Every structure is written in structure tokens, then in C-alpha cells.
């Protein structure tokens, strides 16, 4: 197959043929609007309890903290994305900064933060509301009558249309605990469903984050089944609505953050519209996704510091010849050096050299999985899924390098035997190395420890295993990356740089000592005992060798030198005479092989075959 990756990008490829790489789909512009319900039940504090993990914040406080954390992540990691906060069900109403004292056209809707790239002032105002509880404008005051969901959705429609008209991903996050905002009012339900359909037609995806209280479950079928519009074609791969529980010993804040983080990055295909040829004339279209990708601190833009105020710099490339004349793009030709000379190619000729055939994933055979070695992993695996045009993705370019892959099935996420429950189940493309990618490494056999030491170490390893003997990378953030973002965040918000950062990768030494401290001491004693016995045996062996050296050596007879085969020293004239006199058959096999080897002829076979080879060589060369 052929697709573009992070290692095969060619700087000389034409702009129209370039494929979006991993960073392109990771940094897609996204617009998210939080719609948070401000009601009496959302403002109600959880009941007091002695449980350590019990909720201490109200549902509205947890939702605002979640939005604040989401904004912190976006302002640094994805600075081009937009975010806004819309409070509905409030006593006050506001839609942007209205001029002339005009009242808002959306009753009980308060646009706390307009949909835009988060600025430092937006983060500070939200932080004051979340951490310090400062609400001078009395925003968090519930209205006496519920807000119309049709007005809420229409307000969101206006926000997206005005601020993010051309964004590829636009999403509306609704956080509420009211599963029936309009009760049995069918007209209000119908109006809200129409507004939701308008949002869907606009390309806005509505995501619901319901909050359930103790003794009252959130029933999505009462109202929101008609609001969360899902296309039947993508229903099979849609995420289910997860409910966050309050006052049940679980942290509502952590639950909300977990559910929102699962939808934080929009689904974007690594490649799309790739033909998967199962058999001749049997082809389906697949998309590829890269669920695991290493994040690194990336420079998102250039900054010019030469003026009084720092400004974003726009870079452009200009080609200039030795006479300092600007060279037009049409004047530039591509050339390759052969034998010290440059061979020029036309653009269409250079493109034809890079075209290695159509873009296709073709099955060429089947092998057992046991034949796939662990060292064959040369690139990140790609998850493939059959779907239509519902996700944004990049099309594999025509000049992508061909690559051999193994198509491997993975277990279901709910399978207990699955070692990666955080990854989707399906087919994975496992890139295989070519001959140039494999190195010949001579590895000496490692020393084998004693069985007793191995058994004791097995107990230590078993007691230090992670839960379910499984490593989940989502639980261990990159400490250097998090520190980089923390410093940037402090600089952007004019805050003090934190002294230290929580590093989840640091081993828990106390817990390790509590679990295997005794086993480690026993293993160390056994190792000392085995090492002492080994050193003692080596010392005794060395003493025995010293005693043998001090004894006189017995006189040994010199072995006779082996008789060299005479065949290798025969000249061409001697070989010609032997052929004429028919004496080649009298030569031994060793002599025949010696002659053939000296003449560069294969010396493998029986005596009759060797004689025939030698006769043929003499007839052709002498």
C-alpha cells in the first residue's frame, strides 16, 4: 500500500500533491461552545459526608471548573481554536456587548465568554468566578422560569455563524441535569428540535453531558434524543452519552473532565478514500486513524521582537540567484546529478518518476500472526475503518512511497483478555521493514541467572504489576510537556511560574517498599550467596591453574604437516595434458575440488560431476 507519513515527506513535492501529516490533523481548527444550565438543582451543594472522595462542589461549579481547565489547555496547546461559554436559565440576559441599552433577543441566555480565541482576560475572569467565587454581576442567579431550549440553540447558532463560519469542526457542549426542560409542552419540544436540526445542517455537532443526582437518573429519551441529531451512517461509530453522577462517592468534576476529554480532539482521518482491495474486483473504501501519537512542544508561529511591541511574523520563501535577482517559480527546474552532470526534468517528467501506481491497500496473502516478529515494528500502526465522507481527512498523495504492512485484528474494548482496552477494536495496519531497515546485530547469549534467583524475582515482578497487569498511557501525562505548558500559561496570564510539577511517572517508593521490601531483601541475600559461591569456585580454579603452570611440561612430538593437495598447483598446460591423456579421473576428490576452487568454479558435487566441470573448463579456457 502507499500513504504519506512522518518519515516520507519530500521537500521537493509539489504543493498540490502534499498530504497533511500528523501535525495537520492534530492542530485542526476547532470551535467549542459550552452551554451550561444555571438552575436551582445545579447550584445545590452536595450533602455533607465523611467520604474522602465525595463531591464538594455543586454541579454548576464543577461544570465551570471543567470549562476553565478546558480553556487552559486550549490557550496553550491549540492556540488557534475558539472557545466560548453560554449560560442559560439565568435571571440576567446578555448577548455580546449590546449598544444603546438594547435588551437581548435571547431571554435567560447569558453569553459569559464570546466564541473566540481565549485571551488572558477571559481566562482571568473565568478563574475569578471558579476559584475565588467572585460574581459581581450576579450571573449565577437562576431565573424564575426555565429558559427556552429553542432560544438557547438559536443563540448558539448565531454565535457559530458569526464567529466560526468556516471552521471544519464546530461543537456545542450542553451540561445540564434537567432531562425534561419543557415537560409535556410539545410545541416547545418541536421548536427546539427544529433549531437542533438547523445546527446540524450548519455542521455543528451537539454533545450532551448529563448530570444525574442521587435517586434521580437522567433519562435522555424524554427530550434530548430529538436534540442530539445523529446521522444514521455514522451512528455505528458514534460515542454513547455518558452520565456524570453527583454525590455518589465519585468526583463529579473528574467525571465531567473525563467525559469532555474523550471528545476534546475531533475525529480526523490520517488518510481517507483509500481503496481496500480484498480480492480482484472486490474493493471497499477505508479511512485510517492514528490513535496514539507522541506530543511535543511545537512552535506554532514566529514572533518578531524588533519593534516596540511583539508581533506575529508571516514567513515566505523567495528564491534568488547569484545576481540577486528574484527567480520566478516557472523558471525553476528540477535536476538530478548522474555521473557528475545534472540531468534536468520537466515538472510532468519529475512527477511521473514519483508516481508508483494507484493508491490502494491490496491483500497479497495470509500468514499466521506467530510469524510476525516483535522487532518488525518500524512505524506507528494505523487503525482503519470503513466509512463514508463524514470526517475531515487527507487523501494519500500520488507520490507516496509504497510500503508493506501486516493487517492485524485487535480485540474488543470490553474483552477481558484485551491488553489495550483504551484503543478501538478492528483492523490495524502494522508497517513492516524492508531489507534496508533491518540491521544485522550480533548479540552474545546473555548470562543465565540461577533458577532460585529467577523464582524470587518473579514474586517481586508480580507484586509490582499495574492494575490488571496493564499500562494505560492516558494516566501518565508527559511531565516535560506539562511543565512547558505550565510555564507558557504563567507567562500568558502574568502569574508566578510554579516551583514544581506533579510527575505521575515518578515511582511510588513507599508503596514499592511496602509491597516487595521483604522480597527484595531475600533476593539480595540469595544474590550475595550465589555470587560468593561463584567467586570461591573461580578462586579455586585459578589456584589449580597456577599449580599446573609450575609443573614441567611433558615433551610432545611435533605433528607432521598435512600433505597439501597437488591439484591447486597444476598449470594450464598440465591440465591440458591430463585431459588429452584421460588421467583426470585418476585425481582424488580433494585434488579436483582444489583445482576447481583455484579456477573460480563451483566445487560441489560427486567425483564424476567434478571431473565433468573440470573438463568443460579446460575445453573453454585452455
UniProtKB/Swiss-Prot annotation:
It catalyses: ATP + H2O = ADP + phosphate + H(+). Residues 1-13 have a biased composition (Basic and acidic residues). Pfam families: Ku, Ku_C, Ku_N, SAP. GO terms for cellular component: chromosome, subtelomeric region; chromosome, telomeric repeat region; Ku70:Ku80 complex; pericentric heterochromatin; site of double-strand break. GO terms for biological process: DNA recombination; double-strand break repair via nonhomologous end joining; stalled replication fork localization to nuclear periphery; telomere maintenance. Keywords: ATP-binding, Chromosome, DNA damage, DNA recombination, DNA repair, DNA-binding, Helicase, Hydrolase, Nucleotide-binding, Nucleus, Telomere. Residues 1-26, 537-572 are annotated as: Disordered. Its main location: nucleus. Residues 584-618 form the SAP domain. It comes from the Eukaryota. GO terms for molecular function: ATP binding; ATP hydrolysis activity; damaged DNA binding; DNA helicase activity; double-stranded DNA binding; telomeric DNA binding. Single-stranded DNA-dependent ATP-dependent helicase. Involved in non-homologous end joining (NHEJ) DNA double strand break repair. DNA-binding is sequence-independent but has a high affinity to nicks in double-stranded DNA and to the ends of duplex DNA. Binds to naturally occurring chromosomal ends, and therefore provides chromosomal end protection. Required also for telomere recombination to repair telomeric ends in the absence of telomerase. KU70, of the KU70/KU80 heterodimer, binds to the stem loop of TLC1, the RNA component of telomerase. Involved in telomere maintenance. Heterodimer of Ku70 and Ku80. This is ATP-dependent DNA helicase II subunit 1. It comes from Chaetomium globosum (strain ATCC 6205 / CBS 148.51 / DSM 1962 / NBRC 6347 / NRRL 1970).
Amino acid at each position: 500500500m502507499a500513504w504519506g507519513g512522518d518519515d516520507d515527506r519530500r521537500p521537493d513535492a509539489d504543493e498540490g500533491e502534499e498530504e497533511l501529516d500528523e501535525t495537520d490533523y492534530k492542530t485542526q481548527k476547532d470551535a467549542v461552545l459550552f452551554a451550561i444550565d444555571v438552575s436551582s438543582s445545579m447550584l445545590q451543594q452536595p450533602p455533607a459526608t465523611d467520604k474522602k472522595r465525595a463531591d464538594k462542589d455543586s454541579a454548576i461549579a464543577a461544570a465551570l471548573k471543567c470549562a476553565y481547565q478546558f480553556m487552559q489547555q486550549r490557550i496553550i496547546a491549540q492556540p488557534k481554536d475558539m472557545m466560548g461559554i453560554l449560560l442559560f436559565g439565568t435571571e440576567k440576559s446578555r448577548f455580546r456587548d449590546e449598544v444603546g441599552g438594547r435588551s437581548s433577543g435571547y431571554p435567560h441566555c447569558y453569553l459569559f465568554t464570546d466564541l473566540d480565541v481565549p485571551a488572558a482576560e477571559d481566562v482571568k475572569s473565568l478563574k475569578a468566578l471558579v476559584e475565588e467565587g467572585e460574581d459581581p454581576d450576579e450571573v449565577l442567579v437562576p431565573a424564575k422560569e426555565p429558559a427556552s431550549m429553542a432560544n438557547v440553540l438559536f443563540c448558539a447558532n448565531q454565535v457559530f455563524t458569526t464567529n466560526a463560519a468556516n471552521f471544519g469542526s464546530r461543537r456545542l457542549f450542553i451540561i445540564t441535569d434537567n432531562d425534561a426542560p419543557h415537560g409535556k409542552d410539545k410545541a416547545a419540544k418541536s421548536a427546539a428540535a427544529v433549531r437542533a436540526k438547523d445546527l446540524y445542517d450548519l455542521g455543528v455537532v451537539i454533545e450532551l453531558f448529563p448530570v444525574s443526582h442521587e435517586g434521580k437518573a437522567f433519562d435522555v429519551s424524554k427530550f434530548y434524543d430529538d436534540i442530539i441529531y445523529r446521522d444514521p451512517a455514522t451512528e455505528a461509530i458514534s460515542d454513547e452519552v455518558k452520565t456524570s453522577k453527583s454525590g455518589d462517592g465519585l468526583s463529579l468534576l473528574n467525571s465531567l473532565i473525563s467525559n469532555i476529554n474523550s471528545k476534546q480532539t475531533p475525529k480526523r482521518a490520517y488518510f481517507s478514500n483509500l481503496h481496500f482491495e480484498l480480492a480482484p474486483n472486490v474493493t471497499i473504501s477505508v479511512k485510517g486513524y492514528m490513535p496514539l501519537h507522541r506530543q511535543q512542544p511545537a512552535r506554532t508561529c514566529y514572533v518578531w521582537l524588533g519593534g516596540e511591541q511583539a508581533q506575529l511574523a508571516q514567513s515566505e520563501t523567495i528564491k534568488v540567484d547569484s545576481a540577486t535577482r528574484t527567480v520566478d517559480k516557472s523558471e525553476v527546474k528540477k535536476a538530478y546529478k548522474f555521473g557528475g552532470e545534472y540531468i534536468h526534468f520537466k515538472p510532468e517528467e519529475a512527477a511521473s518518476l514519483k508516481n508508483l501506481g494507484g493508491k490502494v491497500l491490496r491483500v497479497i496473502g495470509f500468514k499466521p500472526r506467530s510469524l510476525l516478529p516483535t522487532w518488525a515494528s518500524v512505524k506507528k500502526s494505523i487503525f482503519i475503518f470503513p466509512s463514508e465522507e463524514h470526517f475531515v481527512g487527507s487523501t494519500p498523495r500520488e507520490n507516496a512511497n509504497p510500503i508493506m504492512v501486516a493487517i492485524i485484528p485487535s480485540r474488543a474494548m470490553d474483552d477481558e483478555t484485551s491488553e489495550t482496552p483504551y484503543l478501538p477494536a478492528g483492523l490495524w495496519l502494522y508497517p513492516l521493514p524492508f531489507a534496508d531497515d533491518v540491521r544485522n546485530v550480533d548479540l552474545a547469549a546473555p548470562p543465565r541467572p540461577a533458577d532460585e534467583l529467577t523464582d524470587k524475582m518473579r514474586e517481586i515482578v508480580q507484586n509490582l504489576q499495574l492494575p490488571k497487569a496493564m499500562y494505560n498511557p492516558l494516566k501518565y501525562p508527559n511531565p516535560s510537556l506539562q511543565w512547558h505548558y505550565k510555564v507558557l500559561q504563567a507567562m500568558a496570564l502574568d502569574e508566578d511560574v510554579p516551583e514544581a510539577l506533579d510527575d505521575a511517572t515518578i515511582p511510588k517508593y513507599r508503596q514499592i517498599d511496602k509491597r516487595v521490601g521483604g522480597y527484595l531483601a531475600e533476593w539480595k541475600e540469595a544474590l550475595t550467596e550465589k555470587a560468593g559461591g561463584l567467586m570461591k569456585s573461580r578462586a579455586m580454579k585459578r589456584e589449580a591453574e597456577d599449580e599446573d603452570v609450575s609443573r614441567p611440561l611433558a615433551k610432545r612430538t611435533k605433528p607432521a604437516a598435512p600433505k597439501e593437495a597437488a591439484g591447486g598447483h597444476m598449470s594450464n598446460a598440465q591440465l591440458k595434458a591430463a585431459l588429452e591423456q584421460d588421467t583426470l579421473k585418476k585425481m582424488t576428490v580433494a585434488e579436483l575440488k582444489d583445482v576447481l576452487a583455484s579456477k573460480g568454479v563451483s566445487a560441489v558435487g560427486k567425483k564424476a560431476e567434478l571431473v565433468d566441470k573440470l573438463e568443460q573448463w579446460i575445453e573453454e579456457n585452455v
